[in-house]
Amino acid sequence: MSNLDSTHHFDVVIVGSGGAGLSLALSLPSHYKIAILAKSSLTEASTFYAQGGVAAVLDKTDSIQQHIDDTMIAGAHLCELDAVKQTVEGGRPSVNFLLKHGVEFTLDEDDQLHLTREGGHSQRRIIHAADATGKAISTTLVQRAKEASNLTIFENFIAIDIITLHKLGHIQQDNRAVGLYVLDEQNEKVHTFLAPFIALACGGAMKAYLYTSNPDIATGDGIAMAYRAGCRVANMEFNQFHPTCLYHPQARSFLITEAMRGEGAYLRLPDGERFMLRFDERAELAPRDIVARAIDYEIKRLGIRHVWLDITHKSAEFIQQHFPTLYTRLLELGIDITKDMIPVVPAAHYTCGGVVVNAQSQTDIEGLYAIGETSYTGLHGANRMASNSLLECFVYGLSAAEDIQQKFEQDFNLPNIPEWDDSQVTDADEDVVILQNWDELRSTMWNYVGIVRTTKRLQRALHRIEMLKREITEYYQDYRVSKNLIELRNLVLVSEMIVRCAMQRKESRGLHYTLDYPELEQQLKKTVLTPPNFEVKQIPVNTL
């Protein structure tokens, strides 16, 4: 990549190489010139690590309305109904899109798509590729992207900021995204990417927490960049903690799929008690927020480090057939899941809030789209239901593709854009400053803004985050950009969003549980942050 010019012109630039970004890229006409920016390797995206599957109404005993109802219940009724309908109705077209591109899903004995069940779903409606669905989808779509002659892939290219007309001084015009500044990590050079259409499909922000199931790329880049560009964000207080992350010193980010509980696994305490029956009549199949809170409660009550997930009452053949990846990986760690229970703890897993978008994935800024975990469509409400997230990626990726085609003009004139200027900065003198701030931020978020919150904890968190942000901002202004500095700058901004939204919500709903306000409020409101000064307000759901 060292011979690249520093300025690149494309029709569409997509930040992110997971399911959301690749579904958009592969749905656009083949004569569009498209860039895909991957922050790491192409498959290093949350999609790759998704074990569960894609929720879709395919069985004749199931219905669109049942899937809508299940989603609304899981989301504590804070979901935007139009978004839920659009997503659920897009289930079959999304599955057809994946099949068309060659994704091989698990079939049943009749050679039909095998459907499993996960927490919150009243029916079997999860299509999957054994217990490694994300890997099957990711590797297939990546291969199709590599085969497409109109797609140019840039690996290890990290977006820094969005270029808009207003940032360039064209205040009299309606604001519009026209490009990005991007760091080529290998050559330590900042490039300018220009395009009339830019899509942020770069995942969530759960690296804000000390313990997470997410890959290292999940630093909230898209959410932070969009906010700095002038886009509203919403519902950042709702962060999902997956109930069952493996507790093992050699595998800190290893997720134990929800499908294991869907297929009958029990959660147990050290004395063998199946404790979920005390918390919810659905037991292990209760929504994730309820299960995660129950585990957190028992860990704190008993002073233990983890609970146990037990599927040993199923036959070895059943376990190896349904969970081949898990069986093999855990065996390598000395755990035979046909005989041994699995030590599990909750871990930060999914960002339910994000950049506010419409049905076409369009943000507040013309030409700028946000798709997947980066976005707030309103689908998830106060809690995401299992396997709705991959579905959302494809539904809104295809929707964004349609919108771009309708607005596409080949003679679109981009203004003159200055190259990145780092003449006034120097190389960082001590990277230990970044490392220290990174660790302090993630510990603060885990201890004060975790599964159970209080007003005092949130106030303490905000105080520390504001101090860290000042320090990081000074560092960013004084020194040459690096991957770690870009990520830390984004993560501290998104962490502040999470805390400010959490402080605004005076109730316990879904994933936001506070001891100071344990009851539900009557009105259903979403929390919206408006840039640049964190103007925060709550407005009724199903309104703009």
Swiss-Prot record:
Catalytic residues, chain numbering: 288
SUPFAM superfamilies for this protein: FAD/NAD(P)-binding domain (SSF51905), Succinate dehydrogenase/fumarate reductase flavoprotein C-terminal domain (SSF46977), Succinate dehydrogenase/fumarate reductase flavoprotein, catalytic domain (SSF56425)
Enzyme class: oxidoreductase
Catalytic reactions on record: L-aspartate + O2 = iminosuccinate + H2O2
Annotated TM spans: none
This protein's record includes keyword DNA-binding: no
Cofactor (UniProt): FAD
UniProt-annotated site: Important in orienting the L-aspartate substrate, residues: 118
Pfam families in the record: FAD_binding_2, Succ_DH_flav_C
InterPro entries: FAD-dep_OxRdtase_2_FAD-bd (IPR003953), FAD/NAD-bd_sf (IPR036188), Fum_R/Succ_DH_flav-like_C_sf (IPR037099), Fum_Rdtase/Succ_DH_flav-like_C (IPR015939), NadB (IPR005288), Succ_DH/fumarate_Rdtase_cat_sf (IPR027477)
GO terms classed as biological process: 'de novo' NAD biosynthetic process from L-aspartate
Family indicated by similarity: Belongs to the FAD-dependent oxidoreductase 2 family. NadB subfamily.
Name by which UniProt lists this protein: L-aspartate oxidase
Organism: Acinetobacter baylyi (strain ATCC 33305 / BD413 / ADP1)
Lineage: Bacteria, Pseudomonadati, Pseudomonadota, Gammaproteobacteria, Moraxellales
